[in-house]
Amino acid sequence: MKAKIKQAMPPAFLAMYRRLWAMVHNLRLLRGLPPSARELYRLGVLTQYNVALLERDERVRTTVQAAAAAIYGDSWNYYSDALRPEIAEGFVRTVDAVAQTNQPVQYLEIGSCQGLSMSLIAGLLRDRSVLGSLVSIDPYFETGYIEGKAGPYRKAEQVAVTKNTKVCAMRLYAQLGLNVEIIERRSGDGLIELIRNARTFDLVYIDGSHEQLCPAIDFGLCNAILRSNGVLILDDHMWPDVQPIKHLCDKHAVKIQETWKTASYRFL
């Protein structure tokens, strides 16, 4: 019966009906989410982005995606979204800002997961002939970790980033010709180790634990290793415990870019 009704409807009317139904469905869905999650879901899931990267940058993005898909299969984007075009565009703007000196960029990433963002940013730096050292801090726990209870959706989730994830990430780096130093420790311990060794960086991406005091601790320690005029990227800045850090950056640093997922700042 429904099929016959659809066939009898003019195409324009049917399209309008589907748009209206989708709108009502999305409104109901949003009302069912915690208030802290509604804007994030709207921007990250419901919003369509028409982003076209420059050919050179799109080539880097698709190369990383193809390599990740070959290693991880259908789960290549697990717990990431780093290669979504609108997010990749933010990374491009960040890399362009830090590459202005035409000197090798020393890059530190806290929380590398499957290696997508590390590979993309490293590829963009290499394409601009400013690739320096690449360092990743990630504990890669045996059985993963639990996150989300204090997040926007107020729902704890078992995150399957394990020792096997590290092995696969290293395969990805090798396939892309990237030499990544992995510090397999919690972010606080890894950052203190870098401070003790007088290591400094031009670009730092904070993508560790987003809950409780972890974002504040990571941010404070990162300021000790960020070089003058260095650039810092905040991940998942719409999470409740990351928002105060973003407010500080908005007030005291120079914003380079902001997406629904990341925000980048230069510290003078």
Residue positions per predicted region:
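A short alpha-helical cap/connector motif
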Residues: 2-268
